[in-house]
C-alpha cells in the first residue's frame, strides 16, 4: 500500500509529461518554417512591411496555416502569430479522449530575429512544471 501511494503519483506525472512532449513536438514544423523564412525572406526591419513579424507568420512564406485542436491532430492546435517585433508559435491542448492533459495546457516559443537572420527562441510552458 505504501509503495502504491508513492509510485502512482510518480507514474501519473511521468505519463502527463510524456503526453506533453507531443504538444512540444507539435510546434516543430512551424518553428522550422519560421526559421527558414527569417533566413530567406524577412528583412532586418523591426516592424512594418518586410519585417520578421509581418512576413514569418501563418499562411505566409512557407509558414503553415494555424490548426485547431481536433481528433485528427491529437487534440493539439498550433498558432503562429506576430508578437511585437517577434513571432510566437503556440501549441495548445483541448480535452481529448484518453489524454492525461487538461484543456488549454500550452507550449509557447517566442522567436526573435537577430541581425544575422538567426532566430533565437525562448519557451514558456503552462503548466510550468511540464518544461
Question: What are the residue ranges of the model-derived segments?
Answer:
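Periplasmic/extracellular, small/polar-rich flexible segments of pilin-like filament-forming proteins
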Residues: 38-131
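Amphipathic alpha-helical segments typified by the pilin-like N-terminal helix
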Residues: 1-37
